[in-house]
């Protein structure tokens, strides 16, 4: 029987890209909660800033139909479709016991991202 040795390496992070998007609409609280329930130890999303300064999670950064599309930076958080969560809502729904990797698509979102992570006590697990 081979000898096994303890490792100093931390365990791998199992990131759920846009949540459990194979089983729930991507980048929704439903998808992120499901990913955590299925064993993800990390959550990943793109992040944008709204007109009123909130960090929100969405892939495309636009809302609306073909002829009425608007960038998230032009829309207040309260006017967004219900399926687009804020980063603060992600922390409320899923807790802070996992890593969060954010692809910052809008440089103006950085302060809002840091504020939300800091308020949740999750700054140390933010990628």
Each model region followed by its residue ranges:
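Active-site mouth loops of central-metabolism enzymes
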Residues: 16-26
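A general structural detector for well-ordered alpha-helical segments in enzyme core domains, enriched
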Residues: 31, 86-90, 109-116
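Catalytic beta/alpha-barrel core
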Residues: 79-83, 99-109, 117-127
């Amino acid at each position: 029987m081979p000898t096994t040795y303890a490792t100093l390496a931390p365990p791998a992070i199992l990131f759920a890209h846009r949540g459990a998007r194979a089983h729930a609409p991507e980048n929704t609280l439903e998808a992120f909660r499901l990913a955590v329930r299925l064993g993800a130890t990390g959550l990943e999303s793109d992040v944008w800033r709204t007109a009123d300064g909130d960090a929100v999670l969405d892939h495309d950064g636009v809302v609306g139909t073909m002829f009425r599309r608007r960038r998230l930076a032009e829309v207040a958080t309260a006017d967004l479709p219900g399926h687009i969560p804020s980063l603060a809502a992600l922390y409320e729904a899923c807790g802070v016991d996992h890593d969060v990797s954010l692809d910052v698509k809008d440089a103006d979102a950085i302060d809002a991202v840091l504020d939300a992570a800091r308020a949740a006590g999750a700054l140390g697990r933010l990628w």
